[in-house]
Amino acid sequence: MHAMDIMRMESGFVHWGHDISPEENQFEAGLSFAISFKKNINFIGRDTLEKIKDKKVEKSLKILTLENSKPGEPLLLHDEPIYHNNKIVGRTTSGCFSFNFNKNISYGYINSGMTSDQIDNSNFEIEVEKKKYRATVLKKPLNSKNIFTL
């Protein structure tokens, strides 16, 4: 079970109930590639998505890695605070240690006081057990054989 969770995180796949839920919309979760407004097909939620598609997202799901990673140090799970300039700007949704890439991986929502480029080029910290660890946002999954990225 844990091996499959690690592989899905390495590949950029999200988990329903952790990384995506009714609290987030498809644009915040990086799933806009799965939506097409070109076809004249009505689907559940289409009207709402059309209303918000051009609005600025309030938060963005990102993949982060920790510097100086070791297995289980720290033990990333979910709901750890994400900091930028000593302010909480988000929370993690999933976490694991990737033995294939020798890194701690975490998914997390970062509140959008910043543009996507600013988020991708900024340094963050993730707090685990009252200790902060430097984190870097990945532009694509570690196992980037995927057809999409967050």
Predicted regions mapped to residue ranges:
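Conserved, structured C-terminal
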Residues: 1-150
